[in-house]
Amino acid sequence: MISCPACGQSCTTPPTNTITATEAAQAFVLKEEFPRQNHELMRLITELWRGNTCDIQQCQNCQLKFAWPFVAGSGEFYNLAYPYSDYPKQRWEWDQSIAALPGINLHGGPVLEIGSGFGYFLKKISPSHLPADRVVAIEYNDFSRNRLNESGFAALGEDIRSASFDSYHKQFSAVFMFQVLEHMDDIAGVVSRINHLCRPGASVFIAVPNHLRIDFNESHQSLIDMPPNHISRWTHAAFSHLGARVGWQMMDYRIEPMSWPAFIKQDLVYTHMRRAQRPGSLANVVRGRRRTRLRMILEGLAALSAAPLRIPSWLDAARSTGSLGGSSWVHFKTPSIR
């Protein structure tokens, strides 16, 4: 039986899409550029899925889209698919979370960020809102974790569901998860564990890719939101049902406003990357070259040359009834009495 990870309802409708391991591997690592890594990635994805295909299901109750099998990428997967770590220094959802901090009692206990990268967000709230020694960070990348520790944060390379966090029972006054939840499986176990680790009335801040933007991208020849990297796509209703299952109160929900310059730039890049996945295409030939400055120039020219073909899609974006900004953000409160 296929059950929705957000609301728990059974999903009986046919999948909205089916993706092969070959397609997934090509989306992450071009075989024309890195044939060995592409082959290894395809093998690994097949092992994760226990087969050659993955379905994309949509819950009719809360509209969550999710991969089935609902299996997250492993450390080995991310080492192959994303060998170079790159973290943004600023995100819209950070500002939303920081603006909410004055209404939160951060003196009650430490705070936790899951997926901290280099700690750019944490440096925005510490020491201005709390000292570094009251911040716990989860980060799997060894290099990033070392940088966090050097900044004075307690950085751990452990899953919150591990026994390493047992000592934090009812300790955290706030939890931050930015662009993390969509990568995780066992959602019920994750939120249940957060409840276990949080003080009564703690705040949980979550940001995920905007489902409206992803739907637009996929319906307009842009990048596919590809598993096993992203395995869930969150709507307002999905968040509401998830919160209700664990007694969380939704305090706020927002979608990032769209910036036209950022939208057009990303659209040109993403559609170029999508075309590059097709063997023999101009984008594929260019992107399959060795990484040099010349290749960067050729890629830029190839992406820009397709701009006139993107105008109908941009007009569709202008007519969209929902914001096509990059992120959705939600602020929950955990139960006051447990």
PLM features: residue spans?
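A short His-aromatic
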Residues: Q179-H183
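Short N-terminal helix/helix-N-cap motif within the alpha/beta-hydrolase-1
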Residues: D185-G189, F216
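Rossmann-like AdoMet/SAM-dependent catalytic core
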Residues: I2, D252, P257, T271-H331
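Short, glycine-/aromatic-enriched active-site segment of Class I SAM-dependent methyltransferases
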Residues: A21-E32, I206-R233, A237-G243, M258
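Conserved N-terminal segment of class I S-adenosyl-L-methionine
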Residues: M1-F178, A188-V191, R254-E256, G280, ...
